[in-house]
Swiss-Prot record:
InterPro entries, alphabetized: UPP_synth-like, UPP_synth-like_CS, UPP_synth-like_sf
Gene that encodes the chain: uppS
Names of required cofactors: Mg(2+)
Binding site for Mg(2+): D25, H198, E212
Cited CDD domains: Cis_IPPS
EC number: 2.5.1.31
Annotated cofactor note: Binds 2 magnesium ions per subunit.
Recorded family membership: Belongs to the UPP synthase family.
Record flagged with keyword rRNA-binding: no
Keyword field: Cell shape, Cell wall biogenesis/degradation, Magnesium, Metal-binding, Peptidoglycan synthesis, Transferase
GO biological process, one term: regulation of cell shape
The protein, known as: Ditrans,polycis-undecaprenyl-diphosphate synthase ((2E,6E)-farnesyl-diphosphate specific)
Alphabetized GO MF terms: ditrans,polycis-undecaprenyl-diphosphate synthase [(2E,6E)-farnesyl-diphosphate specific] activity; magnesium ion binding
Length: 252
């Protein structure tokens, strides 16, 4: 899956971006432009995943999180959902060994209980194979929704309260944050959405509280290393305030 790619160009400032999340949008529209069915676009999008993972691994990014299948995607036509599930199985079978060779740790975030037993087993084996790798952490959000993530975190705290190991007044942002997916990773610094839409679509609602947002009209199958570099360049030139004000600015 990974191949040697050039690091970001010399004129790109040190981007300081540790965790990038991508909403991979535009597969269906890309396929339509080619006169093909949507499944064709999803397969083409898998090639862009390879490019993005390779680029991230070679350019100082610690974690890459990709929105592969939202909890709302079950509402799509059954034929498309079936094609996506088969593509997921194929990707795990064909790519995980390459990820492992390149020291990438693979994790699936989301409620995998709705997937069939074959896919769940592939997920478990893939995560186990790469669990001790120390390079890029690749998170694939599958049957994931930001609201679901927060609710499952609250439910875990409620169970602790019910068991008598936690008092309600002990619940705070830190405790809840420890129950949310990817809590052990660096916070998301940059969210990229391809395909021209300007919305979050229930993705990582907790984790992107202070992330920079970058929207591009490029459809996901066309998103390449230059596009990724452009997003990092934009990020590097933004001033992040985390709710504060510009240094030296005493005016609210």
């Amino acid at each position: 899956m990974l191949s040697a790619t050039q690091p970001v160009s010399e004129n790109l400032p040190a981007h300081g971006c540790r965790h990038v999340a991508i909403i991979m949008d535009g597969n269906g529209r890309w396929a339509k432009k080619q006169g093909k069915i949507r499944a064709f676009g999803h397969k083409a999008g898998a090639k862009s995943v390879r490019r993005a993972v390779s680029f991230a691994a070679n350019n100082g990014i610690d974690a890459l999180t990709l929105y592969a299948f939202s909890s709302e995607n079950w509402n799509r036509p059954a034929q498309e959902v079936s094609a996506l599930m088969e593509l997921f199985v194929w990707a795990l079978d064909s790519e995980v060994k390459s990820l492992h060779r390149h020291n990438v740790r693979l994790r699936i975030i989301g409620d995998i209980s709705r997937f069939n037993s074959r896919l769940q087993e592939r997920i478990r084996k893939s995560e186990a194979l790469t669990a001790h790798n120390t390079g890029l952490t690749l998170n694939i959000a599958a049957n994931y929704g930001g609201r679901w993530d927060i609710v499952q975190g609250v439910r875990q705290l409620a169970e602790q309260v019910q068991a008598g190991v936690l008092r309600p007044d002990q619940i705070d942002e830190e405790r809840l944050g420890q129950q949310i997916c990817m809590h052990e990773l660096a916070p998301v610094d940059l969210v990229i959405r391809t395909g021209g839409e300007h919305r979050i679509s229930n993705f990582l609602l907790w984790q992107i509280a202070y992330a920079e947002l970058y929207f591009t009209d490029v459809l996901w199958p066309d998103f390449d290393e230059q596009d990724f570099e452009g997003a990092l360049h934009a990020f590097a030139n933004r001033e992040r305030r985390f709710g504060g004000t510009e240094p030296g600015d005493d005016k609210a």
